[in-house]
Amino acid sequence: MKISIYGAGNQRLYLEQLKVPEKFGGEPPYGGAGMAIEFAKAGHDVVLSEPNRDVMSDDLWKKVEDAGVKVVSDDIEAAKHGEIHVLFTPFGRITLNIANTIIEHVPENAIICNTCTIPTPVLYRSLEGILRLKRRDVGISSMHPTGVPGTPSQKYYTIAGKALEGKEYATEDQINKLVELVKSVGKIPYVTPADVVPAVADMGALVTAVALVGVLDYYRVGTQIINAPKDMIEKQILISLQTIASIIETSGMEGLMKVFNKDALLSSAKNMLIDERQEDLNLALKIIEEFDKSTIGEKDISQTYLVAPQALIKEAVSLIGKSAVEGMIRRSSNKLFK
C-alpha cells in the first residue's frame, strides 16, 4: 500500500522528557517516524512529511531513510502519494489545517486518519463541506497507536468505525484496508465506534481507566452489598461524571479545585469503604488526602449548567428538529478544538 504520514514526532519529548527507551524499550525514532519505519519494513511504499528537520538528529533521519521511507517537507506532495494518510501531528487546530490542505490532493478513495491529535468526528466535521461537495470518495477514520510507535508495548492500532449515533465516516472497504495494513505489520486492529476512540486509545485512557475502576466498584457495592436499585446506581454514576466534566469544560481544572472541598469529599467517600475488596478507593483516598490543590491553583467557576446531554438532545430534537440539533452539536464540539 501507499502510505503518507504527516509529522515525525517530537523526539526530544520522547527521549528527554518521557524517557521512552528506559521505560518502554525500543529504539528511536519514535512516533510518526517510528510508524513510517514500521510500515516501510513491512513492504509498504511510505512517504513521511515533516517540514521541520530539527525535530530529530541527522542520524535518526538517516535511520528513517535507510528503512526505505521517502522524506518530504511538502504536505501536498505527500497528499498526492498515499492511499492511507496518517496525521501524527500536534493536538488541535494544526491537525485540522493540515487535513484541509491535503484533502483536495489525495487520490480517489483515500482515507485520512487521525492519531491521538483530534477525535475522528471532529476531523470529519472540519472537512464536511468539501467531503459533501467535492470529495465524497474520501474516508475519515483513525490509526491510533495504543502506545508509542517504535516500542514493543505498542501492540494495537485503534481504528474508528461507525459512530455511536450511527454515522459512518468511511466505507467498509476503507476500514478493511486499515485492518489489513495493521495486520501486515504484525499488530492487532481494534475497530471501535469513532466517538469512543479517544477514551480508550488516547493519553486520556489514564482517566478512563481510573474512572472505570471507580464506576465498577460503586456498581458492585451498590447492587450487591447495599442492594440499591440498578437505575439509582447508574444515575448517581452519571451525576458524578457529568459534574466533573461540566466544570472542567467551563472553568478548567482550576475551577474544579475551587468548587470541590477536599475534606468534605474525603469524609463522604470514607463512608463508602464497605468491604476489603476496595483497594482502589483506599488508594484514591490516600492520593486525595496528600494532594496539594496549590499545585494547580483555583479560580471562580464560570456559569455551568449540569445537564444530562442525551436527554437534552432528545428534548431539543422534539422542539426544533434533528437537522438543527445536529448542526448545534457540530458547532459546539468543534469549539473544543479552536
Curated annotation (Swiss-Prot):
Protein name as it appears in the record? H(2)-forming methylenetetrahydromethanopterin dehydrogenase-related protein MJ0715
Q: Which superkingdom does the taxonomy of this entry point to?
A: Archaea
In terms of InterPro entries, this protein maps to: 6-PGluconate_DH-like_C_sf (IPR008927), HMD_C (IPR004889), HMD_C_sf (IPR038182), HMD_N (IPR055205), HMDII/III (IPR010063), METHMP_Hmd (IPR024190), NAD(P)-bd_dom_sf (IPR036291)
The organism encoding this protein is Methanocaldococcus jannaschii (strain ATCC 43067 / DSM 2661 / JAL-1 / JCM 10045 / NBRC 100440)
Family statement drawn from the similarity comment of this UniProt entry? Belongs to the HMD family.
The UniProt keywords, alphabetically, are: Oxidoreductase
Q: Name one GO molecular function term.
A: oxidoreductase activity
Q: Does the keyword Transmembrane helix apply?
A: no
